[in-house]
Amino acid sequence: MKTKRRAFLQRATGLLGLTGLLSLVETKTGANGLPRKSSKAKKPYVVFVTGDHEYSGELTLPLIAAELEKNYGMRTKVLKSEPDYNGEKDIPGLEALREADLAVFFLRWRQLPQDQLNYIDEYLKSGKPVMGFRTTTHAFNYPDGDSRKAWNAFAEKAFGAPPGWGGAAKHTHYGHNSTTDVTVIPAAASNPILTGVAPSFHVASWLYRVQPDYPPKDATLLLMGKAVNPDKEAIDNPVAWTWKNGWGGRAFITTMGHPEDFQVEAFQRLVVNAIHWELGLPVPKNWKGKLDINVPYGHPKKS
């Protein structure tokens, strides 16, 4: 009797063990035997850091973020200056950069406290990719004597862009009544970031002067801009390039970013492509279609 009972228990234990093993396999592979996809693990996390006085970046970039989540399988978070876009000294939530796979900056003349700068510094030193729009060339504006003044050169260190507005690099633009004709640089025509981007298009952004000192010689220039109706003698200047910064991170920056630029399909595709490239993902071959973006310049008037 004891022998039969022992045999039964052994068979039951074996069956339970097999059931547990099958349960474990199904957890990892799914009932159909194919690998189960972890929705959190597979989705890149893109954090947008916004705060500018002029170009409504806190309104345009959330629309890009929504498109990434809806059609491109990404997770996003948009951080904004407080109490509003004019707030220069507080962008809550920067600790999100610790989990980010890509940090996207659209900043202008911020004076963040050191504890917030530390999150950006930590991110840069991780060697993860960075992306910047327009006024990020002069993201910070600390006065002489401030221990944080070195941050005024953020764009130079992170993107190979001029270290702030004016200065020795004579970083300027060609007037608020000008616009820009943009063309693909022939040598860059096969760059994946330019997949599906029209060979020429027009944007509302007045052209930024970055040459002759920037971008660095080891940058890859993608798009060239020509000022239309400039207020001074103008030279053609690159308006988008990539670079490997000193921390080993991929960098993409564009000096475009006027809210009307976001209505231009070529610009939209440039941005989506660049985000994929930054993350080391294949650039989408199938464009999901033009985004409906209609954000005013200068921020909406408050009621």
Question: For each of these PLM feature ranges, what is it?
Answer:
Residues 69, 75-77, 85-88, 99, ...:
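Catalytic beta-strand/loop cores that center a nucleophilic Ser/Cys/Thr
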Residues 9, 65, 121, 194, ...:
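Non-transmembrane alpha-helical segments in soluble domains
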Residues 22-46:
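C-terminal segment of N-terminal export signals and the immediately downstream linker at the start
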Residues 1-19:
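N-terminal secretory signal peptides and thylakoid transit peptides that target proteins
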Residues 47-48, 53-139:
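Helical hinge/lid and interdomain linker segments adjacent to catalytic or ligand-binding clefts
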Residues 38-44, 70-71, 228-303:
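Extracellular ligand-binding/catalytic regions of CAZymes and related secreted enzymes
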Residues 154-155, 203-219, 267-283:
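Oxidoreductase and adenylate-handling cofactor-binding alpha/beta cores
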Residues 110-196:
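A glycine-rich, often tryptophan-bearing local segment used as a flexible ligand/cofactor-contacting loop or short
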